[in-house]
UniProtKB/Swiss-Prot annotation:
Activated by calcium. Autophosphorylation may play an important role in the regulation of the kinase activity. InterPro entries: CDPK_Ser/Thr_kinases (IPR050205), EF-hand-dom_pair (IPR011992), EF_Hand_1_Ca_BS (IPR018247), EF_hand_dom (IPR002048), Kinase-like_dom_sf (IPR011009), Prot_kinase_dom (IPR000719), Protein_kinase_ATP_BS (IPR017441), Ser/Thr_kinase_AS (IPR008271). Pfam families: EF-hand_7, Pkinase. The gene is CPK27. PROSITE patterns: EF_HAND_1, EF_HAND_2, PROTEIN_KINASE_ATP, PROTEIN_KINASE_DOM, PROTEIN_KINASE_ST. PANTHER family: SERINE/THREONINE-PROTEIN KINASE. Belongs to the protein kinase superfamily. Ser/Thr protein kinase family. CDPK subfamily. Ca(2+) 3 binds at residues 417, 419, 421, 423, 428. There are 3 contiguous domains conserved in the CDPK subfamily: a kinase domain, an autoinhibitory (junction) domain and a calmodulin-like domain. The autoinhibitory domain (295-325) inactivates kinase activity under calcium-free conditions. The modification Phosphoserine is found at residue 196. Ca(2+) 4 binds at residues 452, 454, 456, 458, 463. This is Calcium-dependent protein kinase 27. It is a lipid-anchor.
């Protein structure tokens, strides 16, 4: 939701929802964890009186740092109530509050994420066609249309926020998260940064936007569904946001010549950089390619599905390498990072909260915005518990600075170059990825292809070093922390 973290709001006597406190465990049996974020976690739960299964999103009060954040929670609940019952939108059940948390109980969607459904077709060798893509985007744009009609701008449309109601072939796609959503105020120009990389609209980056930004995000999803990758690249650092604002998308490259011209026309209309000229949700649903039965059921080349799989596996090898480097830093090298961690962790809890990170960075001379610090927090918080521990801190700071030292990168290269022949081969890369439970053959081939500038089918040290020093634009630009030598 963008504004959770800190210990400032301890268990308050007044209630956030302005109704009596309730022990949720007397109403529901809380079960397995479904997901975790900076604000808390979502669990499967069973209603004791009926035996029905729901999902329970628990927001810890200690993560709400001010009244603005409390208002964000109340707004999310109001929006879910207002939209409940609309097609393709998760059903709101109820909201409760106890002394520690706010609990939002909603419909349980047991079919997994949207991309998982598509990739399952790839895994079992089934076909995937424009017809499937049109059906998926129809559900997504139907959400946008209903949100806008009901006076809500979603602001964070991405595949991860869409789940399937079941594992059945005819399962319904539903949007589940309204943490970034706002009520649309007539004539208001929105300026705050909201959304996710890849899917964020250019006008959002420019700080001047309205509900049309949701159509752009849906258009990016459609683009990816039809070609298997994003139109924008994250590397080198900062390039993606610049491309979102200005890059002319090339539809002459494969596989676009194989796509229906009407599909391409729709993507172009949804990705018009002028929000005033961009197609509306109702117009998308009425587009010739989108009409029921119009999109081709001819199987799309398997390369698109394999690209989708690689798109999800992006940067996994880098994470494997970073984990190795962090684990092998000497005590002397870690000493400086530990000192910095201790200075920022002012309450000496062993964990850095968002508020401590903001205060610490300001004290160190950083002028990052609130959103940029939140992005940094999210990137460093690997286990998603809302705080940064010492290991996460070392990995995050080492990621940006220790990679400038050849000895660290070379030591990692040697670790993955099992036969010490000066190259990381496909087999060696496969071994490294499988040890970490990441990557398939297509992803591994793509990692090599992306890094292998001399096209010999292997990764030498120079290529490895270049790959590891190429940053992701997920991190805010500029120096975040002082360099530790």
């Amino acid at each position: 939701m963008g504004c959770f973290s800190s210990k400032e709001l301890q268990q308050s006597k007044r209630t956030i929802l302005e109704k009596p406190l309730v022990d949720i465990t007397k109403i529901y049996i809380l079960g397995e964890e479904l997901g975790r974020g900076n604000f808390g976690l979502t669990r499967k739960c069973v209603e004791k009186s009926t035996g029905k299964t729901f999902a329970c999103k628990t927001i810890l009060k200690t993560k709400l740092k001010d009244e603005e954040c409390e208002e964000d929670v109340k707004r999310e609940i109001r929006i879910m109530k207002q939209l409940s019952g609309e097609p393709n939108i998760v059903e709101f059940k109820n909201a409760y509050e106890d002394k520690d948390s706010v609990h939002i109980v909603m419909e349980y969607c047991g079919g997994g994420e949207l991309y998982d459904k598509i990739l399952a077709l790839y895994d079992v060798g089934k076909s995937y066609s424009e017809k499937e893509a049109a059906g998926i985007i129809r559900s997504i744009v139907n959400v946008v249309k209903n949100c806008h009609y009901m006076g809500v701008m979603h602001r964070d449309l991405k595949p991860e926020n869409f789940l399937l109601t079941s594992n059945d072939d005819n399962a319904t796609v539903k949007v589940i998260d309204f943490g970034c959503s706002v009520f649309i105020e007539e004539g208001k120009v929105y300026q705050d940064l909201a959304g996710s990389d890849y899917y964020i609209a250019p006008e959002v980056l420019q700080g001047n936007y309205g509900k049309e930004a949701d159509i752009w995000s849906a258009g990016i999803i459609l683009y990816i569904l039809l070609c298997g990758k994003s139109p924008f690249v994250k590397e080198p650092e900062g390039q993606m946001f610049n491309e979102i604002k200005s890059l002319e998308i090339d539809y002459s490259e494969e596989p676009w010549p194989l796509r229906d011209s009407r599909a391409i026309h729709l993507v172009k209309r949804m990705l018009d950089r002028n929000p005033k000229e961009r197609i509306s949700a109702a117009e998308v649903l009425g587009h010739p390619w989108m009409k029921e039965g119009e999109a081709s059921d001819k199987p799309i080349d398997g390369v698109v599905l394999s690209r989708l799989k690689r798109f999800r596996d992006a940067n996994k090898f880098k994470k494997v390498v970073l984990k190795f480097i962090a684990a092998n830093l000497s005590e002397e090298e870690i000493k400086g990072l530990k000192t910095l961690f201790t200075n920022i962790d002012t309450d000496k809890s062993g964990n850095i909260t968002l508020e401590e990170l903001k205060t610490g960075l300001t004290r160190l001379g950083s002028n990052l915005s609130k959103t940029e610090v939140e992005q940094l927090m999210e990137a460093a918080d690997m286990d998603g518990n809302g705080t940064i521990d010492i290991d996460e801190f070392i990995s995050a700071t080492m990621h940006r600075y220790k990679l400038d030292r050849d000895e660290h990168v070379y030591k990692a290269f040697q670790h993955f170059d099992k036969d010490n022949d000066g190259h990381i081969t496909k087999e060696e890369l496969e071994m490294a990825m499988k040890e970490d439970g990441a990557g398939d053959e297509g992803s591994i081939k793509q990692i090599i292809a992306d890094a292998d500038t001399d096209n010999d089918g292997k990764i030498n040290f120079e290529e490895f070093r270049t790959m590891m020093r190429t940053e992701s634009s997920l991190q805010p630009e500029g120096e975040l922390l002082p360099i530790i030598n």
